[in-house]
Amino acid sequence: MRIALLTYSTKPRGGVVHTLALAEALAGLDGLDVHLWTLGRGGDTAFFRPVDPAVTVHAVPFPDLGDEVGPRILRSIDTLDRAFAAERPAYDVVHAQDCISANAAMRSGPCVRTVHHLDTFTTPELVACHERAVVEPVARVCVSAAVAAEVEAGWGLPATVIANGVDAARFEAGGRDTEGRARWRRRCGRYVLALGGIEPRKGTLDLLEAYALARREVPDLRFVLAGGETLFDYRDYRAAFDRRAAELGVEPEVLGVVAHDALPSLVAEAAALGFVSTQEGFGLAPLEALAAGVPVVARDLPVLREVLGDHVAYAATPDAIAAALLDALAAPPDPARGRAHSHGFTWRRAAAEHLAFYRALG
């Protein structure tokens, strides 16, 4: 079976992390020839990390023209479509991982789509992209039952639930990386960590407010943010974040994208991970933190209850988030339970379930 997985970026966003790990796990199964298609934005010719050579990577050049979000979405679809359509007949399965790659793939034939989470957009081009990528694929995968229920409620469409895996061993090893952790400790001190950038969906302003409250009790506590490479324009939200930080008299450490090899020790050295997204599809970052032995404070969402169970603290407001962070700092939970929970999510299991899904398509 020859499989094409398509994603919109080479950067370390959650959906891209998923796509790489799934491709490698599928390539480890007998009889599968796995190809990974992506847009190489800004001159990228490879993904943010090395990819198993058993996976064939096709990075389609996508120069930065400085265009606005709407035109950039349409150009992304056009560019990926032109490159992929000529090779499409070689594949038995075409599997898109986001709305851009789904729209590109469906121009030349049917595809299946993983709905990682549902978004609410205002840019007309994105609204249309999102809608078509939910409605028109021949079949859908969702990474959680909560998202599958949203798809059913919103569109009356069924989806197969296949949970993500997590590279738990990698983040558990981060806890043993004494040199790496020491480097982060020298740079950042004692810190609450947020992963995923400064974005509305990530609830970053709420976490900022919570951090400022917690800092009144723990004056040496720092707030560190990592990640944030995105296709979308969140400049207004970032400006609001910076203004509010200044008003609160705090100075968050914004790292941007962290090198792949340095991320596990960054996570492991954190005093706690704040994961307070207002909308999520799964939640890889908190599972990675649990694997590293780090306490997690999460927004109280059904999907996070589904994935994380009772292994994290839940909160819904800045006051409650601050209180949960302080509890985690004062009395961290036994890391063994959370670590064991994270090890229950494997990419090998996810790959086997995907293969069964592909075979059921006929």
Language model regions located:
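Nucleotide-activated donor-binding/catalytic signature segment of Leloir-type glycosyltransferases, i.e.
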Residues: G227, R238-D261
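Aromatic "clamp/platform" in nucleotide-sugar-dependent glycosyltransferases that forms part
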Residues: T278
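N-terminal strand-loop element at the rim of the active site
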Residues: L5-R13, G28-R75
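Conserved donor-binding/catalytic core segment of Leloir-type glycosyltransferases
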Residues: A4, V141, R185-K202, L208-Y211, ...
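Short hydrophobic beta-strand element within catalytic cores of glycosyltransferases
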Residues: P286, A291, P295-A298
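Carbohydrate-associated surface elements
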Residues: A146, G165
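A conserved mid-protein helix/loop that constitutes part of the nucleotide-sugar donor-binding site
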Residues: V17-A21, E199-L213, D236
